[in-house]
């Protein structure tokens, strides 16, 4: 391969051109110096979670912000009142509900990220996402956010990765390629990129081996 061909591949490889923009989105929660700043920081992060993962729930923000269920509901209901979220009641969520972003939230997220948001609003908010994937999406969101918010036992900040790309973002980036879809990708602290695959349904060892071998084959082709 010539140096010109190598340069072409690098300049047209999403790993070098598109992924960094998403990896650089700040998804770490910082409480803030006062209650006002705390509220602003929570509002921004909750909107980003809803936009990037399609949904957000009281369970996610309760864990992330270290608050109880009542305060988590108050926080999300306030964002709903402000026109940033809409609530959908569903038994598929551990909280009995999920919150989906609005067009206003999409425009707000664009300002925060500096990235265009591909958003389609629907009069019926329950049609904005696949209810069969609620648990999968919530587990995915927890895992990716957990890696950003990792601490040692002495409270020393020790993130497992510095940023991530969600499944919807990954699909949009690789829309016209034959890249195998993953549940997300993370940028590790050494700058390397790792794929995230969430499997919350039971599969025996043989089934898991088949899946992993398919991923290995895809990696060797890329």
What are these regions (language model features)?
Residues 128, 197-199:
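Short histidine-centered catalytic/ligand-binding loop motif
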Residues 54, 65, 188, 200-202:
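Short, flexible loop/turn elements at secondary-structure junctions
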Residues 69-72, 133, 205-209:
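Flexible, glycine- and charge-enriched loops at secondary-structure boundaries
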Residues 65, 76-80, 109, 143-151, ...:
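Hydrophobic, Leu/Ile/Phe/Ala-enriched alpha-helical segments that form helix-helix packing faces
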Residues 132, 137, 141-146, 154-194, ...:
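Active-site metal-binding core of divalent-cation-utilizing nuclease and nuclease-like domains
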Residues 200-222:
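Catalytic cores of nucleic-acid endonucleases
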Residues 1-122, 126-127:
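Nuclease-adjacent, charged terminal/linker segments that flank catalytic cores
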């Amino acid at each position: 391969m010539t140096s010109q061909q190598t340069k072409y591949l690098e300049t047209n490889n999403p790993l070098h051109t598109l992924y960094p923009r998403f990896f650089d989105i700040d998804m770490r929660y910082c409480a803030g110096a006062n209650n006002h700043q705390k509220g602003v920081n929570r509002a921004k992060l909750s909107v980003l979670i809803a936009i990037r993962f399609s949904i957000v729930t009281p369970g996610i923000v309760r864990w992330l912000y270290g608050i109880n269920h009542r305060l988590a509901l108050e926080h999300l209901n306030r964002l709903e009142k402000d026109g940033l979220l809409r609530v959908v009641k569903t038994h598929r969520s551990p909280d009995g509900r999920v919150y989906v972003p609005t067009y206003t939230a999409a425009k707000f997220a664009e300002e925060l990220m500096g990235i265009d948001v591909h958003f389609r609003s629907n009069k019926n908010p329950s049609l904005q996402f696949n209810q069969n994937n609620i648990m999968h999406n919530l587990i995915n969101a927890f895992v990716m956010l957990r890696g950003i918010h990792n601490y040692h036992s002495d409270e020393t900040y020790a993130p497992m990765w510095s940023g991530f790309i969600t499944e919807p973002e990954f699909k949009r980036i690789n829309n016209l390629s034959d890249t195998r879809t993953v549940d997300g990708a993370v940028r590790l602290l050494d700058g390397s990129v790792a794929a995230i695959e969430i499997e919350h349904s039971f599969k025996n060892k043989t089934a898991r081996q088949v899946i992993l071998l398919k991923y290995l084959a895809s990696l060797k082709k890329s």
